[in-house]
């Protein structure tokens, strides 16, 4: 097959000498113009290897050698390199290939006959090696096509076509070019027909889709009631591009319907364009106009990304609801274009602000991207929602919030109210960098009155579904009403800054439970929650001084308890600092981090994310081990914080149950399967005792062992007549 090896490229290589046959393979290309290709083609089995050396060695060519050189020049006409885009390693080069077509290689045969011959898979009508080899490639491409695409493919290879190929991203070795003909061209001579994935399409198709989207936007925006239009973000332009988003459900729906009608009118390679876009998973798409169309069809918000909005200082919070993803277009090496979409999936995201005031977001492993324009109030609203510090997260019911979308809409509304109560111009520095350092003044939250209104709506009732207690707001248990929550473990290898904000999230989800437990133990007020900055614990965290961290947490907790005992103000972040130790920033959290705090009249297990006080027992839901519908408990006879069993809630006890079932004391051993009464909140519940973690000897195990020993002793006594 015809090709030029990368070893034959020199400074004197001309454009004509870069011409290639239809099969080629490429590697990553650095910045260069079209006359200097350091790496273009390398087909191991091609018979034109070392072409330049061969031509130089001819000297004064004979007539036969002149004929051979003429064939070489003619073979170049099959592919023309018209231009190579500047690349910084993110995208490969851009090659425009002009396929000559079989009709030019077989001028004596009718093109229609050639097309029919290809469709039936017949051999090449010519015995010339180059023509025969190219025929086999074309026949393979036609054979791999499906349905009506076979006819389109056969017509293309017979009549010739112009295609554009793009290199793979971040290539470190040999790569392939993906053509907009859906062909995968490799050096081995294989041409496969891809089905469906739009990531293997080219710029012309993307431009067509982009044009159709833009036409749809203009039609929707200029027609109908203004409330039904797709509005631009403040009408602003970012580097010549209008940043638009789909605001309301009405306009989103109208835009989706209009785009469906528009795409349904066009076909690509014999396949309906609407079907092609819809049938491609958004996770498999390149971030181009096809992805943008997919997002519009799925009513996902879109934004335009500018190069100035791709840098900034970040803070990290954990999102348990909607996941925001964005990436720049691979066809734009200047990184001034891209798309953002949001979907329901938990992940770490970071929020920051650039020097021009744009709020930025970062998704772990995906780099930085633009989320929206606004001020610190908007950023604070996002943080309140992301960290689930809004009242609705503590008082949710299935009837009020049937899905997470409605829940997060309510949380966003409450976050706006909270920030409004704070005031937009508080002058508080809440900038946080990637090391987890917060500005000197910390985050100012609420006054006592506002705190009572927005942050204390904690219900103490747990809902039972199918005979089990339902806790939390994760996807397995959205029907909960109460303050118990199953928190899934993220793993030990967590960065320090991520760990702190994961701690913020978990503490935020259990503040009501913790403070209620403290109130019961201390028999006094808990004081006012407010933020007064971050102690030395967070400042030393990045240096890994574990002893200092633990000592600081102990001291902070001691001072916090002293203030609470007298009803004085207590920093909310003081509680976070203490409970932060339950997350741990090393893989040896139990050895290096504070696991429990105990004293006269109170006990807090910071080794567990949720601790609640029931009748003489500490009921805990440990990270990573609890299942939905279960409350694990510990016994006062065993070490504090050790999981020994589970209580399965059956139903709320009625009058007859109060007389028929026992209410165990804190030190009583419970047999597995026993049904007992437990005080949960204001009501008593019938609970069935289950064994806990198999790695721990449970109360049931202890009692079974004691019973077995007693039975064996009695049997021996009977055997010997004692």
Curated annotation (Swiss-Prot):
Disulfide bonds: none annotated. The keyword Cytoplasm does not apply. Keywords: Host nucleus, Virion. The keyword RNA-binding does not apply. It is found in: Virion; Host nucleus. One of its GO terms (cellular component) is virion component. The RNA polymerase is composed of three subunits: PB1, PB2 and PA. Involved in transcription initiation and cap-stealing mechanism, in which cellular capped pre-mRNA are used to generate primers for viral transcription. Binds the cap of the target pre-RNA which is subsequently cleaved by PB1. May play a role in genome replication. This is Polymerase basic protein 2.
């Amino acid at each position: 097959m015809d090709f030029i090896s990368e070893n034959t490229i020199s400074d004197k290589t001309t454009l004509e000498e870069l011409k290639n046959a239809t099969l080629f393979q490429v590697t990553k290309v650095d910045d260069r113009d079209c006359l200097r290709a350091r790496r273009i083609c390398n087909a191991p089995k091609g018979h034109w290897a070392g072409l330049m050396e061969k031509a130089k060695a001819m000297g004064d060519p004979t007539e036969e050698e002149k004929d051979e050189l003429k064939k070489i020049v003619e073979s170049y006409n099959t592919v023309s390199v018209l231009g190579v885009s500047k690349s910084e390693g993110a995208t490969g080069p851009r090659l425009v290939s002009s396929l000559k077509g079989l009709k030019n290689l077989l001028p004596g045969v009718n093109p229609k006959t050639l097309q029919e011959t290809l469709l039936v898979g017949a051999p090449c009508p010519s015995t010339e090696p180059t023509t025969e080899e190219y025929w086999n490639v074309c026949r393979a491409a036609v054979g791999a096509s499906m349905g009506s695409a076979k006819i389109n493919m056969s017509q293309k290879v017979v009549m010739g076509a112009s295609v554009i190929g793009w290199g793979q991203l971040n290539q470190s070795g040999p790569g392939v070019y993906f053509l907009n003909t859906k062909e995968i061209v490799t050096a081995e001579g294989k041409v496969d027909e891809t089905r469906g994935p739009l990531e293997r399409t080219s710029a012309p198709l993307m431009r067509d889709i982009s044009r159709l989207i833009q036409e749809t936007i203009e039609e929707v925006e200029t027609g109908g009631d203004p409330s039904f239009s797709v509005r631009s973000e403040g009408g602003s332009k970012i580097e010549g591009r209008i940043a638009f988003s789909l605001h309301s459900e009405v306009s989103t729906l109208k835009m989706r319907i209009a785009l469906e009608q528009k795409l349904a009118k066009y076909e690509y390679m014999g396949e309906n364009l609407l079907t092609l876009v819809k049938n491609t998973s958004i996770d498999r798409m390149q971030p181009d106009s096809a992805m943008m169309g997919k997002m519009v069809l799925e009513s996902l918000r879109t934004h335009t990304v500018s190069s100035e909005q791709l840098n900034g200082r970040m803070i990290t919070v954990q999102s348990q609801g909607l996941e925001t993803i964005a990436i720049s277009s691979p066809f734009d090496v200047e990184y001034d274009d891209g798309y953002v979409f949001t979907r329901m999936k938990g992940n770490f995201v970071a929020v920051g602000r650039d020097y021009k005031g744009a709020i930025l977001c970062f998704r772990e492993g995906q780099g930085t991207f633009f989320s929206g324009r606004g001020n610190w109030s908007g950023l604070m609203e996002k943080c309140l929602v992301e960290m689930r510090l809004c009242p609705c997260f503590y008082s949710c019911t299935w009837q009020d919030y049937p899905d997470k979308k409605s829940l997060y809409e309510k949380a966003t509304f409450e976050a706006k109210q909270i920030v409004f109560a704070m005031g937009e111009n508080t002058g508080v520095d809440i900038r946080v960098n990637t090391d987890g350092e917060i500005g000197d003044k910390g985050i100012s939250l609420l006054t006592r009155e506002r705190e009572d209104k927005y942050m204390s709506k904690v219900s103490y009732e747990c809902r039972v579904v199918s005979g089990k207690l339902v806790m939390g707001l994760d996807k397995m248990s959205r029907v909960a009403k109460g303050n118990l929550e199953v928190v899934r473990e993220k793993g030990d290898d967590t960065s320090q800054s991520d760990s702190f904000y994961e701690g913020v999230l978990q503490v935020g989800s259990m503040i009501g439970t913790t403070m209620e437990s403290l109130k019961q133990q201390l028999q006094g007020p808990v004081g006012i929650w407010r933020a007064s900055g971050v102690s030395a614990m967070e400042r030393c965290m990045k240096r890994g001084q574990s002893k200092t961290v633990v000592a600081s947490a102990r001291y902070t907790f001691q001072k916090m308890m002293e203030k609470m005992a007298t009803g004085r103000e207590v920093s909310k972040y003081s509680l976070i600092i203490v409970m932060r130790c339950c997350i741990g920033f090393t893989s040896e959290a139990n050895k290096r981090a504070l696991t429990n705090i105990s004293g006269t009249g109170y006990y807090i297990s910071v080794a567990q994310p949720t601790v609640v006080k029931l009748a003489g027992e500490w009921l805990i839901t440990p990270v990573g081990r609890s299942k939905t519908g279960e409350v694990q408990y510990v016994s006062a006879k065993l070490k504090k914080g050790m999981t020994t069993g589970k209580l399965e809630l059956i139903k709320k006890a009625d009058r007859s149950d109060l007389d028929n079932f026992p209410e165990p004391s804190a030190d009583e051993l419970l047999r597995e399967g026993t049904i007992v009464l437990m005080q949960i909140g204001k009501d008593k519940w019938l609970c069935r005792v289950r064994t806990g973690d198999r790695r721990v000897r449970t109360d049931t195990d202890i009692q079974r062992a004691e019973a077995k020993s007693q039975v064996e002793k009695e049997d021996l006594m009977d055997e010997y007549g004692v």
